[in-house]
Structure formats: C-alpha cells, structure tokens
Regions:
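Charge-rich, well-structured scaffold segments of protease-associated domains
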Residues: 1-31, 99-100, 104-256
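His/Glu-based metal-binding/catalytic segments typifying zinc-dependent metallopeptidases
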Residues: 30-89, 255-256
Length: 256
C-alpha cells in the first residue's frame, strides 16, 4: 500500500541507487475498510467543553459528506461552498468579521478521502457573541439554501478557481502533490481539463441545487470550547427558542 513519489533534480538511475535498501521491506497483508460507518443524527447537537477564563469561544461544526473526487459531487460541492465560507469574500467572513466584528476569521470547507468525507465550518468569536454567532451562521446556511448564490458570486467563484489553477503546479512540492494525487486516486492525467469544463459550464441553478442537498444544518454536530459559565445559559435558550430557526438544538456538556 506504499508508494514513493520524487520530484527534483535527480534522474531515475541515481534515485534507484539511493533507495535500494527498500528492497529489504517485507510485504504484509493489511486490511483497509472500503468505507466507515458513522451513526446518523436527526438533531443539531451542541457539545460544550469548558475552558476556564477563555475570552473567546472556538466553534467547529460539521456533518458527513461525500468522499473525495475530482469531477463529481465532492468537487462540485467545493465550488458551491466557496461563496459561503471559502475565504475573506465568503458570507461567513463578511457577516461575522466585517459586519459584526466578532471574529478574525470564519471559514467552511468540504474535506474528503477515498474512505470518507465531511463538511466543516469553524470560527472563534468573542465570548459574549457565542449564541448570536451561532444564529448568524445558521441564518447564512438558511439563506444560501433557500435564496442561493448570486450571479456575481458565481462569476467571482469561477474566476477564483480558474485563476489559482495556473499557480498550483509551479514548485516541486506542488508537482509532487499533483503526481501523488493521480497515483492515490488512479486519476486520468487530464482531470484538470475536466474540472475546467465543469467550472465554465456550472450555473446558478446547479449551485443552488447542490446547496440544498449537500449542506445539512439539521444534521450538524457542533463543538464549542469556551467559558461555560458565561455562555451555557444563552446556549440553553437555543433549545427552546431559535429565533425562527427550525432546528432541534440539543446541548450536551463534555467533561474532562
């Protein structure tokens, strides 16, 4: 199950002479599950971990998502996520940082391998804004799923993805990552062209449909690390009143 990828100023014969010792490795039978099963949830659970004296609350939330691919649902979900939490132009950042001033950053992403995948959103906010930040985050989820992406956001996303592609294969490390990705996932060498075609052809209606299916606030597991004595009561209020958010929040305290 091991592979070696080398990029640098070295030819094949010189490299082989340097790694000749690897021939002494003995192969073993290794069982690797093709997938991992996780319990499904139908409620939005907040796991609260106390950090005495903390001036901020660290918030991370997520749910299961698609396994890694280069031109399927996983890749298209990455495109969809960019206007929401892909960086400083994302809705989370503009709301929580630029508008509210509660945080230095707020991002979301899809992560995946050939075994599993996940969607995650994370930020650190002022302690007194913990519950309000949660409400704003879920408001952004709701808005993106119901109203969808704007044409301006769509064009900005396409330009960002296509623009950064030109700079992704310049260094030795970047080239190594590219080759390793091809080997790991048995990819066609022309997969980049396939991605470019998807980016050029994807529409607002495509993105809106993906957002409705791939973002699941109702299945979100939320972990908050902060000063529980200042935030627990406000978080408990979310169990009975969600400011119009139709999610079944449940608070569970983690002790250590």
């Amino acid at each position: 199950i091991s592979s070696l990828v080398v990029v640098g100023d070295i030819d094949q014969s010189s490299l082989l002479s340097k790694i000749n010792f690897l021939k002494s490795w003995k192969s073993k039978e290794v069982f690797i599950p093709s997938s991992f099963d996780f319990p499904e949830t139908n409620e939005t659970t907040i796991y609260l971990l106390d950090k005495e004296g903390a001036s901020q609350s660290f918030i991370v939330m997520g749910h299961q998502a698609d396994k890694y691919d280069v031109d399927g649902d996983y890749f298209k979900s990455q495109i969809m996520n960019y206007p929401l939490g892909g960086g400083m132009s994302g809705r989370f950042f503009l709301n929580l940082r630029e508008d509210k001033g509660w945080t230095y950053g707020a991002n979301s992403m899809f992560m995946g391998s050939d075994k599993m995948g996940a969607f995650a959103m994370f930020t650190s906010v002022k302690t007194e804004a913990t519950d309000s930040a949660l409400i704003e985050i879920f408001n952004e989820f709701n808005s993106y799923r119901t109203i969808g992406i704007s044409e301006k956001e769509l064009q900005f996303t396409k330009d960002a993805f296509l623009g950064r592609e030109a700079l992704k294969y310049e260094t030795a490390g970047q080239k190594l990552g590219f080759l390793n990705r091809i080997l790991t996932y048995d990819l066609d060498k022309g997969y980049i062209e396939s991605q470019a075609n998807i980016l050029n052809s994807i529409t607002k209606s495509d993105i809106d449909a993906i957002a409705k299916v791939k973002i699941k606030p109702e299945n979100m597991a939320i972990v908050i690390v902060g000063n529980k004595y200042l935030i627990k009561k406000k978080l408990k209020n979310l169990e009975s009143s969600t400011d119009g958010l139709s999610y079944n929040f449940k608070i569970k305290e983690i002790k250590y």
